[in-house]
């Protein structure tokens, strides 16, 4: 029961983070990186689907479903509002790996292998945002990134509470926890003089 409560709190935190992020984007306080967000739109749905099949537990995967919907909304909303940054070559690499993971899942019917392969484009997808925020910490505000991190921390606790002797179920939320927290930490830095 407590795992369902933690999962629910994680989803609420996730949704609140998306609302805050989209408001900041409209005010020009956050600049969604086109590479990162376009890869997320393509990859998070597959990530969610493979995680559901891999873990066999929808409660563990609910945050990924919320993230998939939130990423898709944010991408198209920022695209419509003209707030996305320009694309760069990292997109192609991550998308190719994502398509490869899709093929692995389809061909071998192995969701676990596909989900582990998907962790590579997930990391790659964050790199453009990391590069942008390292250059200019004002590209992002820390709050939504820390809220997303907190949501993934709760998801890690949910996975542990619903343990099924599948340690790979932890890889995805741990990956997301550190990737999101890193953006939040870089967003808190003051801009370095040129």
What is each model feature region?
Residues 1-194:
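Alpha-helical membrane-protein topology signature
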């Amino acid at each position: 029961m407590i795992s369902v409560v933690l999962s629910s709190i994680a989803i609420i935190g996730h949704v609140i983070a998306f609302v805050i992020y989209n408001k900041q984007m409209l005010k020009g306080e956050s600049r969604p990186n086109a590479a990162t967000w376009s890869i997320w739109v393509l990859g998070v749905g597959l990530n969610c689907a493979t995680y559901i099949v891999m873990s066999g537990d929808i409660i563990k995967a609910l945050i990924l479903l919320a993230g998939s919907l939130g990423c898709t909304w944010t991408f198209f909303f920022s695209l419509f509002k003209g707030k996305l940054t320009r694309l760069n070559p990292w997109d192609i690499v991550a998308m190719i790996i994502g398509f490869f993971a899709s093929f692995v899942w389809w061909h071998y019917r192995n969701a676990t292998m596909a989900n582990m392969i998907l962790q590579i484009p997930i990391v790659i997808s964050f790199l453009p945002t990391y590069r942008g925020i390292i250059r200019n910490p004002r590209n992002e505000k820390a709050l939504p990134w820390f809220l997303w991190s907190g949501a993934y921390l709760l998801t890690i606790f949910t996975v542990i509470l619903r343990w099924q002797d599948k340690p790979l179920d932890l890889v995805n939320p741990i990956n997301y926890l550190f990737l999101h927290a890193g953006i939040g930490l870089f967003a808190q830095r003051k801009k370095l003089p040129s």
